[in-house]
A protein has these predicted regions:
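Gly/Thr-rich phosphate-binding beta-strand-loop-beta motif of the actin/hexokinase/Hsp70
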Residues: 1-19, 270-275
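Conserved acidic
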Residues: 21-54, 59-152, 156-354
Length: 354
């Protein structure tokens, strides 16, 4: 694995590369030939970075194909354009990129602080309209190396995400999917074809097996057209405890509750995947829903056999629901996503009542 990070200025660029297998750090400054040579030696490795999927890989590919890295950087940052749209010849360069940022929600500096490490910022402005001095380049290199070192730390703190990703690649047999998020890979594995009409978002119903009496008014709340709004919620007492029902899940807890002794914790295993299978609520973008069931059954089989391949299948099964709410994913199906959420809440309520 090669960890890497680019810093790009108008008249200068540099990259810090870390070959983790031998703990070798290398810095290349304004030298495309050196970068080409390094790439040719390591082109079959996995390239790891922080937001490299959206930025660094395109700087890398642009330099390899003779383009100006500063113009590429402006294309991505200032013009807010995707890196792949800069030049077609860059698409010919294949890199197996893994982006640590894929499974995170904050920038690198946030995690540096969270780990108790120093948050280093370079004093060299990216707006400098001249060549950098040797001293400035040295400072930028120090800052860049620090970011690579921090990326390595975060990577190993979250190595299970990487292991799961490798497992998915092994299952699909498609190494080009390495840079994708797990929800994107889920879409690929399920052969999803985007729906052309999703205007039935609030065409919801309730489980046909539902058996409610005391709390039937909660079921009716979901069927009331006045409540077809994500901002709406119902707060009501269930077995004497305030519960909130809505389109984001069921929440209920006793305030400032304290208990000393044994506490029974119960969890519904694979609730959403089970609902999607048993009530036919998988995204309608999936032409053959049996694929999802086969993946679920395969995961249970692997888990029973103590085969680690069950690990990458868990996020695929769980993230399918999230993809059904993502407009940019081919699995997007807000109606069925809403039904899954409603079914789950009402069936848990059924369990409480009965």
């Amino acid at each position: 694995m090669i960890f890497y990070d680019f810093e790009v200025f108008r008249y200068d660029w540099l990259v810090v590369l870390a070959d983790y297998s031998n703990k070798d750090f290398k810095t290349i400054v304004n030298n495309p030939d050196q970068l080409i040579e390094y790439f040719n030696v390591h082109k079959n490795d996995i390239w790891v970075g922080f937001n490299n999927k959206n930025y660094d890989q395109y700087i890398f590919k642009g330099i390899l194909t003779g383009h100006n890295p500063y113009k590429i950087s402006r294309h991505i940052i200032a013009n807010k354009m995707p890196g792949f749209s800069y030049r077609d010849d860059m698409k010919k360069i294949y890199m197996s990129n893994y982006d640590v940022y894929n499974t995170l929600q904050h920038g690198l500096k946030f995690y540096e602080g969270s780990m108790g490490d120093s948050i280093e910022e370079s004093s060299v402005s990216f707006d400098i309209d001249r060549k950098l001095t040797p001293e400035e380049l040295k400072e930028v290199e120090k800052y860049c190396r620090h970011d690579v070192e921090e990326t390595i730390k975060i990577f190993f703190k979250r190595k299970d995400d990487f292991i799961a990703q490798l497992g998915l690649i092994k299952l699909t047999g498609k190494p080009h999917l390495m840079p994708r998020t797990q929800t994107q890979i889920a879409s690929q594995m399920l052969n999803a074809e985007a729906l052309t009409d999703t205007s039935d978002e609030f065409d919801v119903d309730t489980p046909p097996t539902l058996n409610l009496s005391k709390y039937s008014y909660i079921k009716e709340w979901y069927l009331d057209s006045n409540n077809m709004n994500y901002e709406k919620s119902l707060t009501t007492k269930v077995v004497g405890v305030d519960h909130i029902f809505g389109f984001g899940g069921l929440h209920g807890a006793r305030e400032k509750y304290h208990h000393k002794g044994k506490i029974l914790v119960m969890d519904v295993a694979s609730l959403y995947p089970s609902l999607m299978i048993n009530y036919n609520l998988l995204s309608r973008a999936v032409v053959d829903p049996t694929i999802y069931k086969e993946l679920r059954d395969k995961r249970l089989q692997y888990k029973k056999e103590h085969n680690n391949l069950h690990l990458p299948l868990k996020p695929i099964l769980n993230k399918t629901y999230g993809a059904m709410k993502d407009r940019n994913n081919t699995l997007y199906d807000p109606r069925n996503a809403n039904r899954v959420c409603i079914y789950g809440q009402l069936l848990l309520l059924d369990l409480i009542e009965n």
